[in-house]
């Protein structure tokens, strides 16, 4: 089955000059979340960003470094050659910020959420990002908890994490939702920004393939997507999972979440048909390929 909803955006369908990805709330057709990915080169080394009523988390994807000038302070972010190469530094910019973002080359993500409260800017070090092996067996994956409620409290609505899945494994499993309907009290919009690698690649590869399933409670949306590197899927509602990494094609996705709750939360409701899987993990070992990366680079688990 192919995509039947308007929630799937193939790579390039949301591009702009020097922006492989430009997704705001208007284009998404919802209230809170957005993401921009900027591409830097000799002809485009610096951009100016005005957040207005949004807060943001800046994450280098394939830039070795990025410089942020926020008011009278300069922040030097340690980057990486690609999302499969290492964990990177990150930066939180509060609502109302105007700042410049500069890099010599590569891509940098600016994740946003509508905000009503203002917090202080923050430079997060890669070495301080909690790296969590999650799941077990063929559902073992790595979660980099960049700006989650537990890892970073000083934000209004935005929640950011990265998930890396070894080739042949599943993530987003069991299927779960956080749409505030049909008995699930938790409400967050969510963006999935996918990069599909190739064996031993630092970043995404055009040959990479993966798979993703999403469906609503009423089954009016039931999408099974063949993913290419750089694709986006947005989730205003419904169950999502699994995200499947094909053998030898590791999968990365950057999640951006935000919702109306006064207190940020990552709570969700499993599909009751598959909740039992969490108990099955108790008797399974985690895949030794996880974690795949750290602040220092690739993790050698051989």
What are these regions (language model features)?
Residues 95, 103, 110-115, 147-150, ...:
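Short, structured patches in soluble enzyme cores that scaffold and shape functional sites
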């Amino acid at each position: 089955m192919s995509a039947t909803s308007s929630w799937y955006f193939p790579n390039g369908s949301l591009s702009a000059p020097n922006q492989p990805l430009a997704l705001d709330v208007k284009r998404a057709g919802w209230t809170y979340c957005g993401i921009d990915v900027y591409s830097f080169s000799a002809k485009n080394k610096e951009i100016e960003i005005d957040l207005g009523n949004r807060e943001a988390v800046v994450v280098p994807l394939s830039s070795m470094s990025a410089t942020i000038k926020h008011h009278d302070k300069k922040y030097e972010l340690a980057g990486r050659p690609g999302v499969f190469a290492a964990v990177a530094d990150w930066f939180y910019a509060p609502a109302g910020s105007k700042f410049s973002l500069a890099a010599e080359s590569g891509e940098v993500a600016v994740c946003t959420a509508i905000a009503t409260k203002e917090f202080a800017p923050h430079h997060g070090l890669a070495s301080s990002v909690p790296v969590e092996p999650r799941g077990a067996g063929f559902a073992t994956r790595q979660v980099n908890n960049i700006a989650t409620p537990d890892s970073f409290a000083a934000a209004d609505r935005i929640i950011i994490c990265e998930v890396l899945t070894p080739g042949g494994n599943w993530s987003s499993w069991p299927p779960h939702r956080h749409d505030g309907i049909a008995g699930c009290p938790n409400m967050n919009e969510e963006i999935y920004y996918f990069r599909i690698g190739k064996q031993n690649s630092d970043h995404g590869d055009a040959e990479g393939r993966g798979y993703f399933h999403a469906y609503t409670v009423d089954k009016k949306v039931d999408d099974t997507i063949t993913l290419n590197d750089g694709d986006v899927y947005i989730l205003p509602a419904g169950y999502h999972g699994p995200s499947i990494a094909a053998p030898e094609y590791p999968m990365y996705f950057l999640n951006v979440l935000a919702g109306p709750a006064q207190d940020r939360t990552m709570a969700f409701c499993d599909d009751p048909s598959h909740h039992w899987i969490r108990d099955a993990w108790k008797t399974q070992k985690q895949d030794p390929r996880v974690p795949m990366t750290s602040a220092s680079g690739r993790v050698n688990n051989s």
